[in-house]
Protein backbone atom coordinates (compact mmCIF):
# COMPACT_ATOMS: atom_id res chain seq x y z
CA UNK A 1 0.00 0.00 0.00
CA UNK A 2 1.34 3.47 -0.82
CA UNK A 3 2.59 5.25 2.30
CA UNK A 4 3.12 8.95 2.97
CA UNK A 5 5.96 9.61 0.47
CA UNK A 6 4.16 7.88 -2.39
CA UNK A 7 0.88 9.69 -1.70
CA UNK A 8 2.68 13.02 -1.39
CA UNK A 9 4.39 12.48 -4.76
CA UNK A 10 0.96 11.94 -6.31
CA UNK A 11 -0.49 14.98 -4.53
CA UNK A 12 2.27 17.24 -5.84
CA UNK A 13 1.71 16.00 -9.38
CA UNK A 14 -2.03 16.56 -9.13
CA UNK A 15 -1.52 20.04 -7.72
CA UNK A 16 0.75 20.98 -10.61
CA UNK A 17 -1.60 19.68 -13.31
CA UNK A 18 -5.09 20.31 -11.94
CA UNK A 19 -5.38 23.44 -9.81
CA UNK A 20 -7.51 26.06 -11.57
CA UNK A 21 -9.19 23.56 -13.89
CA UNK A 22 -12.88 22.63 -13.82
CA UNK A 23 -14.35 19.13 -13.98
CA UNK A 24 -16.69 18.91 -16.96
CA UNK A 25 -17.88 15.31 -16.65
CA UNK A 26 -17.11 12.06 -14.87
CA UNK A 27 -17.58 8.45 -15.95
CA UNK A 28 -17.49 5.59 -13.44
CA UNK A 29 -16.52 2.22 -14.91
CA UNK A 30 -16.55 0.15 -11.71
CA UNK A 31 -19.03 0.61 -8.86
CA UNK A 32 -16.54 -0.56 -6.22
CA UNK A 33 -14.50 2.55 -6.91
CA UNK A 34 -17.37 4.70 -5.58
CA UNK A 35 -18.66 2.36 -2.85
CA UNK A 36 -17.95 5.01 -0.19
CA UNK A 37 -20.25 7.48 -1.98
CA UNK A 38 -23.74 6.94 -0.57
CA UNK A 39 -25.46 7.70 -3.88
CA UNK A 40 -22.99 5.76 -6.00
CA UNK A 41 -21.77 6.70 -9.47
CA UNK A 42 -24.67 9.01 -10.35
CA UNK A 43 -24.24 11.07 -7.20
CA UNK A 44 -20.45 11.31 -7.59
CA UNK A 45 -20.71 12.48 -11.21
CA UNK A 46 -23.39 15.03 -10.30
CA UNK A 47 -21.40 16.44 -7.40
CA UNK A 48 -18.24 16.79 -9.49
CA UNK A 49 -19.81 18.41 -12.56
CA UNK A 50 -18.84 22.08 -12.81
CA UNK A 51 -16.57 22.00 -9.76
CA UNK A 52 -13.32 23.93 -10.00
CA UNK A 53 -10.24 22.33 -8.43
CA UNK A 54 -8.86 25.02 -6.13
CA UNK A 55 -6.19 23.05 -4.29
CA UNK A 56 -4.93 19.71 -3.05
CA UNK A 57 -4.39 18.27 0.41
CA UNK A 58 -3.01 15.24 2.18
CA UNK A 59 -3.23 13.82 5.69
CA UNK A 60 -1.21 10.64 6.17
CA UNK A 61 -2.08 8.27 3.32
CA UNK A 62 -5.24 10.14 2.29
CA UNK A 63 -5.24 12.82 -0.38
CA UNK A 64 -7.94 15.08 -1.72
CA UNK A 65 -8.76 17.75 -4.27
CA UNK A 66 -10.40 20.88 -2.85
CA UNK A 67 -13.45 21.83 -4.91
CA UNK A 68 -15.14 25.21 -5.33
CA UNK A 69 -18.59 25.26 -6.88
CA UNK A 70 -22.22 26.16 -6.30
CA UNK A 71 -22.35 23.84 -3.26
CA UNK A 72 -19.51 25.66 -1.50
CA UNK A 73 -16.19 24.15 -0.46
CA UNK A 74 -16.08 20.37 -0.74
CA UNK A 75 -13.39 17.80 -1.35
CA UNK A 76 -12.87 14.85 -3.65
CA UNK A 77 -11.22 12.34 -1.32
CA UNK A 78 -9.00 9.75 -2.99
CA UNK A 79 -7.84 6.57 -1.31
CA UNK A 80 -5.28 4.71 -3.39
CA UNK A 81 -5.76 1.40 -1.56
CA UNK A 82 -3.22 -1.23 -2.60
CA UNK A 83 -2.85 -0.35 -6.26
CA UNK A 84 -4.67 2.90 -7.05
CA UNK A 85 -3.15 5.31 -9.56
CA UNK A 86 -4.14 8.89 -10.40
CA UNK A 87 -2.97 9.49 -13.95
CA UNK A 88 -2.99 12.50 -16.26
CA UNK A 89 -3.15 11.72 -19.96
CA UNK A 90 -3.01 8.36 -21.79
CA UNK A 91 -3.11 5.21 -19.65
CA UNK A 92 -1.34 1.92 -20.30
CA UNK A 93 -3.88 -0.37 -18.57
CA UNK A 94 -7.38 0.56 -19.76
CA UNK A 95 -8.72 -2.76 -18.43
CA UNK A 96 -8.13 -1.43 -14.89
CA UNK A 97 -9.65 2.02 -15.49
CA UNK A 98 -12.24 2.65 -12.76
CA UNK A 99 -13.09 6.37 -13.07
CA UNK A 100 -12.31 9.05 -15.67
CA UNK A 101 -12.92 12.77 -15.15
CA UNK A 102 -12.75 15.06 -18.19
CA UNK A 103 -11.58 18.61 -17.46
CA UNK A 104 -12.54 21.86 -19.13
CA UNK A 105 -9.32 21.93 -21.18
CA UNK A 106 -10.01 18.46 -22.61
CA UNK A 107 -7.46 16.64 -20.47
CA UNK A 108 -8.50 13.54 -18.54
CA UNK A 109 -7.82 12.52 -14.95
CA UNK A 110 -7.97 8.72 -14.66
CA UNK A 111 -8.25 6.52 -11.60
CA UNK A 112 -6.72 3.13 -12.38
CA UNK A 113 -6.91 0.43 -9.71
CA UNK A 114 -6.07 -3.18 -10.46
CA UNK A 115 -7.16 -4.55 -7.07
CA UNK A 116 -10.12 -2.16 -6.58
CA UNK A 117 -9.41 -1.47 -2.90
CA UNK A 118 -9.24 2.29 -3.46
CA UNK A 119 -11.83 4.80 -4.55
CA UNK A 120 -13.24 8.34 -4.79
CA UNK A 121 -15.77 10.14 -2.63
CA UNK A 122 -17.03 13.74 -2.54
CA UNK A 123 -17.55 15.03 0.97
CA UNK A 124 -17.83 18.22 3.00
CA UNK A 125 -14.86 19.89 4.67
CA UNK A 126 -14.74 20.31 8.45
CA UNK A 127 -12.36 22.30 10.63
CA UNK A 128 -10.22 20.22 12.99
CA UNK A 129 -7.30 21.64 14.97
CA UNK A 130 -7.24 24.72 12.76
CA UNK A 131 -7.08 22.70 9.52
CA UNK A 132 -9.83 22.11 6.95
CA UNK A 133 -10.17 18.38 6.40
CA UNK A 134 -12.64 16.12 4.59
CA UNK A 135 -14.99 14.51 7.11
CA UNK A 136 -13.68 10.92 6.60
CA UNK A 137 -10.13 12.10 7.33
CA UNK A 138 -10.93 14.13 10.45
CA UNK A 139 -9.85 11.36 12.87
CA UNK A 140 -6.44 10.87 11.25
CA UNK A 141 -3.48 12.24 13.24
CA UNK A 142 -0.92 14.62 11.78
CA UNK A 143 2.11 13.00 10.15
CA UNK A 144 5.83 13.60 10.85
CA UNK A 145 6.19 15.84 7.78
CA UNK A 146 3.27 18.09 8.77
CA UNK A 147 4.60 21.52 9.77
CA UNK A 148 2.19 21.48 12.75
CA UNK A 149 3.23 18.00 13.93
CA UNK A 150 3.82 18.25 17.69
CA UNK A 151 6.49 15.66 18.36
CA UNK A 152 6.51 16.32 22.11
CA UNK A 153 2.78 15.64 22.42
CA UNK A 154 3.09 12.44 20.38
CA UNK A 155 5.98 11.25 22.56
CA UNK A 156 3.88 11.89 25.68
CA UNK A 157 1.02 9.89 24.19
CA UNK A 158 3.33 7.02 23.24
CA UNK A 159 4.82 6.86 26.74
CA UNK A 160 1.30 6.58 28.11
CA UNK A 161 0.59 3.49 26.02
CA UNK A 162 1.59 -0.09 26.86
CA UNK A 163 2.10 -1.22 23.29
CA UNK A 164 4.86 -2.24 20.89
CA UNK A 165 6.56 0.68 19.17
CA UNK A 166 5.99 -0.63 15.64
CA UNK A 167 2.32 -1.22 16.38
CA UNK A 168 2.09 2.37 17.64
CA UNK A 169 3.79 3.75 14.52
CA UNK A 170 1.15 2.06 12.37
CA UNK A 171 -1.74 3.49 14.42
CA UNK A 172 -3.03 6.30 12.19
CA UNK A 173 -4.78 7.96 15.14
CA UNK A 174 -1.41 8.44 16.89
CA UNK A 175 0.84 9.32 13.96
CA UNK A 176 -0.23 9.03 10.33
CA UNK A 177 1.47 8.19 7.07
CA UNK A 178 3.85 5.56 8.44
CA UNK A 179 3.28 2.10 7.00
CA UNK A 180 5.15 -1.18 7.24
CA UNK A 181 8.07 -0.18 5.02
CA UNK A 182 8.90 3.14 6.64
CA UNK A 183 8.28 1.81 10.16
CA UNK A 184 10.99 -0.81 9.59
CA UNK A 185 13.32 1.79 8.09
CA UNK A 186 12.80 4.27 10.95
CA UNK A 187 13.33 1.58 13.60
CA UNK A 188 16.54 0.44 11.91
CA UNK A 189 17.82 4.01 11.78
CA UNK A 190 17.04 4.48 15.49
CA UNK A 191 18.43 1.02 16.46
CA UNK A 192 15.12 0.02 18.06
CA UNK A 193 13.43 -3.40 17.90
CA UNK A 194 9.82 -3.13 16.75
CA UNK A 195 8.53 -5.11 19.73
CA UNK A 196 9.93 -2.77 22.37
CA UNK A 197 7.16 -1.36 24.58
CA UNK A 198 6.57 2.36 24.31
CA UNK A 199 6.01 2.92 28.03
CA UNK A 200 9.48 1.49 28.69
CA UNK A 201 11.24 3.80 26.23
CA UNK A 202 12.75 7.16 27.11
CA UNK A 203 11.44 10.39 25.66
CA UNK A 204 14.78 10.80 23.88
CA UNK A 205 14.57 7.40 22.19
CA UNK A 206 10.93 7.88 21.15
CA UNK A 207 11.85 11.28 19.73
CA UNK A 208 14.70 9.65 17.82
CA UNK A 209 12.30 7.09 16.30
CA UNK A 210 9.89 9.81 15.14
CA UNK A 211 12.75 11.95 13.82
CA UNK A 212 14.06 8.91 11.95
CA UNK A 213 10.63 8.31 10.42
CA UNK A 214 10.54 11.89 9.17
CA UNK A 215 14.09 11.71 7.81
CA UNK A 216 13.50 8.42 5.99
CA UNK A 217 10.28 9.67 4.43
CA UNK A 218 11.97 12.87 3.24
CA UNK A 219 14.64 10.77 1.54
CA UNK A 220 11.97 8.58 -0.06
CA UNK A 221 10.04 11.62 -1.21
CA UNK A 222 13.16 13.00 -2.90
CA UNK A 223 13.47 9.73 -4.83
CA UNK A 224 9.84 9.57 -5.92
CA UNK A 225 8.79 7.02 -3.30
CA UNK A 226 9.18 3.24 -3.16
CA UNK A 227 8.05 1.05 -6.06
CA UNK A 228 8.45 -2.73 -5.89
CA UNK A 229 6.28 -3.18 -8.97
CA UNK A 230 4.39 -1.00 -11.43
CA UNK A 231 1.32 -0.68 -9.19
CA UNK A 232 2.65 2.51 -7.59
CA UNK A 233 3.47 5.30 -10.06
CA UNK A 234 3.24 9.08 -10.11
CA UNK A 235 0.70 11.02 -12.20
CA UNK A 236 2.90 10.58 -15.28
CA UNK A 237 3.06 6.80 -14.84
CA UNK A 238 6.67 6.82 -13.56
CA UNK A 239 7.90 4.62 -10.68
CA UNK A 240 9.88 5.80 -7.67
CA UNK A 241 13.29 4.32 -6.88
CA UNK A 242 13.73 4.51 -3.09
CA UNK A 243 13.57 0.68 -2.99
CA UNK A 244 17.27 0.79 -3.96
CA UNK A 245 18.06 2.67 -0.74
CA UNK A 246 16.15 0.53 1.78
CA UNK A 247 18.26 -0.46 4.79
CA UNK A 248 15.88 -2.94 6.44
CA UNK A 249 12.65 -3.73 4.59
CA UNK A 250 12.90 -6.77 2.30
CA UNK A 251 16.56 -7.48 3.17
CA UNK A 252 16.22 -10.80 5.01
CA UNK A 253 19.55 -12.68 4.99
CA UNK A 254 21.48 -9.74 3.58
CA UNK A 255 24.21 -8.09 5.69
CA UNK A 256 23.23 -5.13 7.84
CA UNK A 257 24.90 -2.11 6.28
CA UNK A 258 25.86 -0.88 9.75
CA UNK A 259 27.30 -3.98 11.48
CA UNK A 260 27.40 -6.77 8.88
CA UNK A 261 25.08 -9.22 10.69
CA UNK A 262 22.46 -10.98 8.58
CA UNK A 263 19.13 -9.15 8.60
CA UNK A 264 16.14 -11.09 9.92
CA UNK A 265 12.45 -11.25 9.16
CA UNK A 266 9.64 -12.12 11.56
CA UNK A 267 5.86 -12.26 11.26
CA UNK A 268 4.01 -9.15 12.37
CA UNK A 269 0.24 -8.50 12.10
CA UNK A 270 -0.14 -10.62 8.92
CA UNK A 271 2.89 -8.82 7.51
CA UNK A 272 6.64 -9.03 7.99
CA UNK A 273 9.12 -7.04 10.05
CA UNK A 274 12.75 -6.74 9.00
CA UNK A 275 15.47 -5.87 11.51
CA UNK A 276 19.10 -6.36 12.51
CA UNK A 277 19.45 -8.78 15.47
CA UNK A 278 22.60 -6.99 16.61
CA UNK A 279 21.75 -3.31 16.13
CA UNK A 280 18.10 -3.71 17.16
CA UNK A 281 18.18 -5.97 20.21
CA UNK A 282 14.88 -6.51 21.97
CA UNK A 283 16.60 -6.49 25.38
CA UNK A 284 19.08 -3.68 25.93
CA UNK A 285 22.62 -4.98 26.71
CA UNK A 286 23.69 -4.45 30.35
Curated annotation (Swiss-Prot):
* Ligand binding (DNA): 96, 115, 161
Catalytic positions are: 2 (schiff-base intermediate with dna), 3 (proton donor), 61 (proton donor), 271 (proton donor)
Q: Which cofactor does it need?
A: Zn(2+)
Reaction(s) catalysed by this chain, per the record, are: Hydrolysis of DNA containing ring-opened 7-methylguanine residues, releasing 2,6-diamino-4-hydroxy-5-(N-methyl)formamidopyrimidine; 2'-deoxyribonucleotide-(2'-deoxyribose 5'-phosphate)-2'-deoxyribonucleotide-DNA = a 3'-end 2'-deoxyribonucleotide-(2,3-dehydro-2,3-deoxyribose 5'-phosphate)-DNA + a 5'-end 5'-phospho-2'-deoxyribonucleoside-DNA + H(+)
Set out the biological process GO terms recorded for this chain's protein. base-excision repair
**Which molecular function terms from Gene Ontology are attached?**
8-oxo-7,8-dihydroguanine DNA N-glycosylase activity; class I DNA-(apurinic or apyrimidinic site) endonuclease activity; damaged DNA binding; zinc ion binding
| Chain intervals annotated as zinc finger (FPG-type) | 247-281
UniProt keyword list: DNA damage, DNA repair, DNA-binding, Glycosidase, Hydrolase, Lyase, Metal-binding, Multifunctional enzyme, Zinc, Zinc-finger
Which InterPro entries does the entry mention? DNA_glyclase/AP_lyase_DNA-bd, DNA_glyclase_Znf_dom_DNA_BS, Formamido-pyr_DNA_Glyclase, FPG_cat, MutM-like_N-ter, Ribosomal_uS13-like_H2TH, Znf_DNA_glyclase/AP_lyase, Znf_FPG/IleRS
For the keyword Transmembrane, the answer is no
SMART domains with a match to the protein in the record = Fapy_DNA_glyco, H2TH
> Which sequence ranges are marked TM in the entry?
none
Q: What's its EC?
A: 3.2.2.23, 4.2.99.18
Q: Show the disulfide pairing.
A: none
> Key word ATP-binding present in the record?
no
Note on how the cofactor is bound: Binds 1 zinc ion per subunit.
Q: Which family does it belong to?
A: Belongs to the FPG family.
Family annotation (HAMAP family): Fapy_DNA_glycosyl
Q: How does it assemble?
A: Monomer.
Q: What is this protein called?
A: Formamidopyrimidine-DNA glycosylase
Q: Which organism is it from?
A: Mycobacteroides abscessus (strain ATCC 19977 / DSM 44196 / CCUG 20993 / CIP 104536 / JCM 13569 / NCTC 13031 / TMC 1543 / L948) (Mycobacterium abscessus)
Amino acid sequence: MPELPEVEVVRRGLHHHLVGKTIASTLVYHERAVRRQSGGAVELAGLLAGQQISGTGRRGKYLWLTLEGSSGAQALVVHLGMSGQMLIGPISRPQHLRIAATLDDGSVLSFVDQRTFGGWMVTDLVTVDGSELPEPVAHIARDPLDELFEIGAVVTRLRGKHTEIKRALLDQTVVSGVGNIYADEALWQARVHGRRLTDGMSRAKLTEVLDSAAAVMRLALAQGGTSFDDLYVNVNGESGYFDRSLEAYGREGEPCRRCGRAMRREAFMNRSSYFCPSCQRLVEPR
